[in-house]
Structures are given as structure tokens and as C-alpha cells.
Amino acid sequence: MSASAVNVNPGRNVVVVGTQWGDEGKGKIVDWLTDHAQGVVRFQGGHNAGHTLIIGGKKTILRLIPSGIMHPGVACYIGNGVVLSPEALFKEIGELEAAGVDVQNRLFISEATTLILPYHIAIDQGREARRGAGKIGTTGRGIGPAYEDKVARRGLRVQDLFEPEIFAERLRENLDYHNFVLTQYLGVAAVDFQQTLDTMLSYADRLRPMVTDVSRRLYDVNAAGSNLLFEGAQGTLLDIDHGTYPFVTSSNCVAGAATAGAGVGPQKLNYILGITKAYCTRVGSGPFPSELYDADNAARQEAIGLELATVGKEFGSVTGRPRRTGWLDAAALRRSIQINGVSGLCMTKLDVLDGLDEVKLCVGYKVDGKNVDLLPRGASEVARCEPVYETFAGWKESTVGIKEWDKLPANARAYLSRVQEVAGIPIDMVSTGPDRDETILLRHPFKV
């Protein structure tokens, strides 16, 4: 269904979150919903997660700038919960402007956003190299170390760039600490103070027109009737608190993070849309109970898993890493629904299951001989989970491009209906292909 064909209520706010380990297809859905939003907000993460959009057959990958930038007239916001690499930001702006997209007149960056500096990247990559086989799977872009500095109260913010003397003083203090770690513990080269200072201050004048009090601006435009769409990155099971720790990202990926990461009150969030693929994927290390295929693990290479990866084109949009694949895990989905307070689900990539003889759904686990119906909290316990499956007859008909529920194959509807039943909440949207209009709408998030 075309998003523009729906009338919605003004002044409503929707949060889009991934319910799995990221890569759920949030970018397409955010793009679809943006037809009814006047602003799109990033509230956590950095340029470590890519959102892939297919618009008019053209593929665009956005890593930092909100997906709404592809819609003329839509304001885009980077909140204080994001960690910002100016280098990555201006590279992305350059790519978009070269394609004719107006960016700098519509992009607003919180003055309180923490900066990613060269020493964060050096530490990130140095640590991962030192871990060897025990690596976490970081993208090496400095996101984690930047969040560490933020929590340790030594982070440098965007607003600090506009006070060069204070910035230089704090940068020198930070480098005294971080260069000791780099040279004495990680055994890599130190980061040069003057070069870093000159590079970072060179961004100040270019950033200044986009920097503002994002929290205040969001409050004002929403009060005036604008609909806001909060765009989560990564997924709930990668959340620093609620994910499969320590195999997680360094920020809170859950819906509640939209309030702290953008500076809005929780009562302003009207609807939480949870995005889930019709199967599961994971990139990098960490437990994965329903796993079928892992290119790096000979014991996890079932043919059906490779088929899901191949048909679903499961390669990271930023890293290019092959994703591990498995059946949809409803017990993990229930955990995500509870944590986020999900209002309704959007099921993506249903078409990847077309042609399978049978489809399985993990509805719980056996853990140390006990039945468990919810994903455990710790990685070691999750690693001991033995999936309990329900099996469904597959469908040979194609679901690609279907825009109405009743036109789905009967077996596909049966599978989706069971997912709703086990999840305990409705499926409000179904994606049947990569193009934005290949979408079934059952209940509109901006109208509920």
C-alpha cells in the first residue's frame, strides 16, 4: 500500500525499534512512515549501523543521517544520545548532496551530542585486535569508546568545538590518558594532539549552522502539530542493558532510549512499532538459539540457513559481513515486546520464506532441562538454550509485492497468525519486498 493514501492524526509520535539483533529492515519502514511525519529523529548509536532504502529502484544506505532526509521538506534531527563522527557526517552529507538531496537546511544536531575522535577509533580497533578469537564483533568505528568517555564525564561534545581553548585543554587531558592506554597496554601508536585538534576544530564552522537545542525544537514543532518519527538503530537484543551482554552494542537500543536520547518526555511517545524479520539474523559474535547457518562455524551450516542468507541478501550494509541466519525466535521476540512496550509489529522479508517446504518458529527453549518461554538475560544462559520449534507447511506461491492481507497464500497467513498469537500483540504491517510500496498495512501507527 502507498503510504500517501492514508489520512493520519496530527501531533502524534511513533518510535520504530528493532526487536532482534538489528538488520530487521527498519530503514524501509521508516521511509514508508515518513510520508506522514514532519520530522525524523535519531536518538542513539553512531555510524556503525546502516539503514538501507530502496526508492524508485535506487539503493541508498544511510549510516548517521535519519532516513527522512530522502523526503523533501522533512526535518531530520540527531539527538544527544547519538555519538557523532564529523568526518562520517560530512562524507554522508557530500554523498547525498552529490545526488541532489538538500541536507544542511533540514538537518539539526543537538549541541549536547558526544563527538567521536581519532583516539576512540584507535582504541576500538586496538582492543578488538588484542581480543583475538574472543572478539565482540565491533565495527571498529569508535562508537563504544566514545560512549565510555561520555559516561566517564570526559567526553567532548559538539558544543565544545565552539570554544577552542576549552576544547584544546580537555583534548590534551584526554590524550594523556588515552595515549597511555594505546601505547602501554594495546601496543599501538599514539594519537597526535595538534593534528587531532586542527582536524576537529576545522569542522566547527561547517557544523555551526546545523547545531541547535534539539530537545526544545522537538517540543515546539510537536506542540504545533508536527508528527515525529523516532528512528532506532541496531536492535533490542543488542541493547547494552537488555541484550545478550557482553555481545552487545554500547548504547540503549530500546524505545525508552528515545526519551533520554532526544530529550522528549515519555508521554510524548504514542505508538511503538517493533520491526521483526520473518526469520532471524545476527552479525558477529554472541549466542543465537535458533541459528541455522554461520559461515565461520562448520557445525552451523544447514542448507536452509544458507538459502535464507542467499535469498535474503544477508550481508551487513556497513560492514559487508555475512549475517548468521536462523528461524524466527518468538521467545526472544516476546522479551523485546515486553522491554519496549511494543504497540504492534511489522513483519519484514516475508517473501524470503517463499518456496520453502516447511517453516519453523521457535516458541521457547529447554535450558538445563527446564522449559523456558522467554529469552534469558545473560549470554552464557542464552548459549545453553535448546530451541523448541513449531513446524508449519510452507507456501510455493510468491508473496513479493502483495499489498493486501487476504491475497497472501493461506499458509503464509497461518504462519503470521501464529506469530501474532505467540507474541501477544498484532502484526500491523507486513513487508513483502524491498520497495517502499511493497507493504501490507493493517493498522497505521500514526492513526492508532
Swiss-Prot record:
Keyword Chloroplast: no
Binding site for IMP: D23, E24, G25, K26, N48, A49, G50, H51, T139, R153, Q234, T249, R321
Cell compartments where the protein resides: Cytoplasm
UniProt: GTP binding residues: 22-28, 50-52, 323, 349-351, 431-433
Keywords noted in UniProt: Cytoplasm, GTP-binding, Ligase, Magnesium, Metal-binding, Nucleotide-binding, Purine biosynthesis
Summary of subunit composition and partner proteins: Homodimer.
Catalytic reactions on record: IMP + L-aspartate + GTP = N(6)-(1,2-dicarboxyethyl)-AMP + GDP + phosphate + 2 H(+)
Pfam families (UniProt xref): Adenylsucc_synt (PF00709)
Active site: D23 (proton acceptor), H51 (proton donor)
Cofactors (names): Mg(2+)
Residues that bind substrate: S317, V318, T319, G320, R321, P322, R323
Protein known as: Adenylosuccinate synthetase
HAMAP family, per database record: Adenylosucc_synth (MF_00011)
Single GO molecular function: GTP binding
Pathway: Purine metabolism; AMP biosynthesis via de novo pathway; AMP from IMP: step 1/2
Binding locations of Mg(2+): D23, G50
Organism classification: Bacteria, Pseudomonadati, Pseudomonadota, Betaproteobacteria, Burkholderiales
GO BP, sorted A to Z: 'de novo' AMP biosynthetic process; IMP metabolic process
Disulfide bond entries: none
CC terms in the record's Gene Ontology section: cytoplasm
